[in-house]
Amino acid sequence: MLSPKRTRFRKQHRGRMKGISYRGNRICFGKYALQALEPAWITSRQIEAGRRAMTRNVRRGGKIWVRIFPDKPVTVRPTETRMGSGKGSPEYWVAVVKPGRILYEMGGVAENIARKAISIAASKMPIRTQFIISG
């Protein structure tokens, strides 16, 4: 699972996801990519599940790049706890994804193989996505 080695602060505000992604919205490394169409928090488990699904499908053929990193801690309070007494403890990590952001890239394989592998990874994501080709 992906997570930062160390952060400056243990806890963060939730924030809000306005607008579209201006950074990380172009294909940089591979030829094919999976692009987000909706805003969401994507957990490190979901990122890893998508990466594993793609790797298993492509076998040794191509190369895969994960273009998002979960750097936001999400805190959860223990169950049946009364209100107050501070914020909960960090439970898992999420990547904040806005529409237009590239999630995964792939290269070194035929288009039909890439399309199949990326569609399997897309089914692991909690948002609508699209398959795009560079060029």
Curated annotation (Swiss-Prot):
Gene3D superfamilies: Ribosomal protein L10e/L16. GO terms for molecular function: rRNA binding; structural constituent of ribosome. One of its GO terms (cellular component) is chloroplast. The keyword GTP-binding does not apply. Belongs to the universal ribosomal protein uL16 family. It comes from the Eukaryota. One of its GO terms (biological process) is mitochondrial translation. The gene is rpl16. PANTHER family: 50S/60S RIBOSOMAL PROTEIN L16, LARGE RIBOSOMAL SUBUNIT PROTEIN UL16M. The keyword Plastid applies. This is Large ribosomal subunit protein uL16c. Part of the 50S ribosomal subunit. It is found in: Plastid, Chloroplast. Its main location: plastid.
